[in-house]
Amino acid sequence: MKSTFLFALFVLFLAASEAATDYPTNPPTTPPTPAPTSTPLPSSAASPELVAQLLNAPSELDRIKLLKDNQFVFDFKNSKLGVTQGTGGKTVATSRTNFPAVIGHNVAMTVGFIEACGINLPHTHPRATEINFIASGKFEAGFFLENQAKFIGHTLEAGMATVFPQGAIHFEINMNCEPAMFVAAFNNEDPGVQTTASSFFGLPADVVGVSLNISSIQTVEDLGKHLPQNPAVAMQACMKRCGFSD
């Protein structure tokens, strides 16, 4: 497991150094353009049959024979695979279905292209620990692991990295006036992701109401309808400081 995670870290730094080379650094002159949806963009994917064959291959040699050469490359900059778009930027994530070469290696990766004042909303990865490397810009990031644990928060600049333990609620905020990028590596090819607020409001409304000490079911339902898309636009103070709002 240690060697697998060290490999993930090596890939993370290699990908980040390459991707950061020509990532735009000029401050935007207008606010980020809102996106119509945060659902993954349409993409082709490995067939369920291929995924099953790779998972059940008797050896690594057999697994490699099942893949074409181009299936060992994933283009985070231009890919339409694994993309989630919001008002505050986009994240691009590999998975078994969109990057089948990871199957059997216990690694996965997500790259976040976060706009000025954007936030990768609080979320968890139920099946993986994350190491997050800042490729460009600067982020405020933090996590909360469990009841009675303390909140851990950091300001991370380009070239720095942090760890989010498996299952911890965590976030990344770009509080600056220009785009920023992070590269997240995982020690599981299927790390999973659960956005905290949307998952919470997906529970029965009366359960959510009791949890928030709100007696009105209608109020709970109204709150759930106005959750931001991920990545979202962050605090209004940042928008005002950057000249994006009055």
From Swiss-Prot:
SUPFAM superfamilies given in the database record: RmlC-like cupins
Leftover remarks: Spherulin is a major encystment-specific protein.
Chain positions covered by the region annotation Disordered: 23-45
Protein name: Spherulin-1A
Highest taxon listed in the record's lineage: Eukaryota
PANTHER family in the record: GERMIN-LIKE PROTEIN SUBFAMILY 3 MEMBER 3
Pfam families to which the protein is assigned, alphabetical: Cupin_1
Key word Metal-binding present: yes
